Amino acid sequence: MPIIIKDGGTQRDFTPHPEVEGAPAVCIDALDLGWKEGAYGLKYRVALVFYTGLVEKGPEGQNVQLTVAKFFNASFNEKSSLSSFVKQWMGQAYKLPDNDLEKLIGQTALLSIAHNATAARTYANIESIMKLPAAMADQAPPIPGDFVRLCDREDWPGPAPHPEMSQPAAAAVSAEKMPWE
């Protein structure tokens, strides 16, 4: 599902995922969002995206999968929210191989999703997560066949670079040859 940005810089209108307690879900994407400015300064951000099997009709009548995402600072420190979330989901003894978030794609979960409202819109947030019980394994939705990961989409520019590391366009292209060229 594309993330369309309006000219004003805010995201498009969307239907938040309905509030649910104990929804079987599957992790369908791990996003590398790059450097983002937040309330506590510049942080490297990642996200995990889940699909619960719910679909709505889009503006042109097409089926649109409803997804819900959880955003984190990219840190596996024992006190980080990402580390706590993965342990809550996979169990205290679980160690993510090579700290590779993509290894979580395809893993099932049981989610509790709640709405948080602001003056501008309503957001669906993952309030809790746990491993899907074996008795509910047949209720987990499959990853939709037409789903394309964000990093595989043609219109995705990639993670946001650190502002101090990006070069101005004029500096990137230099007509002057270096002595060794």
Positions of the model-derived regions?
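Short beta-rich binding modules
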Residues: 1-181
